[in-house]
A protein has these predicted regions:
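Mid-length scaffold segments of soluble, non-membrane domains
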Residues: 67-114
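Bacterial Sec signal peptide processing site at the extreme N-terminus
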Residues: 16-34
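Helix-rich interaction surfaces within compact, conserved domain-sized segments
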Residues: 106-169
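Sec-dependent bacterial lipoprotein signal peptides
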Residues: 1-18
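Structural motif
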Residues: 48, 77-79, 142
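Short, surface-exposed charged micro-motifs
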Residues: 41, 68-70, 134
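N-terminal post-signal-peptidase region of extra-cytosolic proteins
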Residues: 53-66
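A short, Trp-centered hydrophobic/proline-enriched beta-strand micro-motif
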Residues: 41-56
Length: 169
């Protein structure tokens, strides 16, 4: 019994110590959230930001976790590097580039219909298709993206705004 008690006591103390050391105060959390909200607002107003995608939701089938995909808005250009799963109607032979392209933004609008987030509509034309990117970004940096194309099925993504990208600084 003594052999079991000491390791168990050490484990309980270690877990409780980690919880105490890592918790932030209410004031620290409020300051962090305000800083994140200000960084989101600044990125959207200047039109220079990156959204790292972590999950995709095809119109048919189940959602899939993804990594190393993103969209980036910089200097009036949308740099889209997104996976696509779904039906396509008119595409070049071989499938084309789908949602992987760099294209000038035709229309960019930002609205704030909610107190904790923004809606961004980005319209682009590529040589293959026309795309409407509807992006909802919350004050904490989480984002939801819905892509509608003329020649492909609608697809949705979720991700997070990259505040600390070295390329944006």
């Amino acid at each position: 019994m003594k052999k079991l008690f000491l390791p168990l006591l050490a484990a309980v103390l270690a877990v409780s110590a980690c919880g105490i050391l890592s918790s932030e105060t209410r004031e620290e959390r409020v300051v962090r959230e305000a800083k994140e909200a200000q960084m989101v607002r600044q990125g959207l107003e200047t039109g220079n930001f990156t959204i790292d995608i972590d999950r995709m939701y095809p119109l048919r089938g189940s959602s899939k976790m993804v990594s190393n995909y993103s969209i980036k808005v910089k200097d009036g250009v949308l740099i889209s590097h997104l996976p696509f799963i779904g039906q396509a109607w008119r595409v070049p032979y071989g499938g084309g580039h789908a949602l992987t392209f760099d294209a000038p933004i035709v229309n960019y609008t930002v609205t704030q219909p909610r107190t904790d987030g923004y809606e961004i509509r980005i319209y682009v034309k590529t040589d293959e298709d026309e795309h409407l990117y509807r992006l909802t970004v919350f004050d904490n940096g989480r984002a939801s993206l819905d892509v509608q194309s003329q020649n492909r099925e609608r697809i949705s993504y979720t991700g997070e705004m990259d505040f600390y990208s070295k390329e944006e600084k």
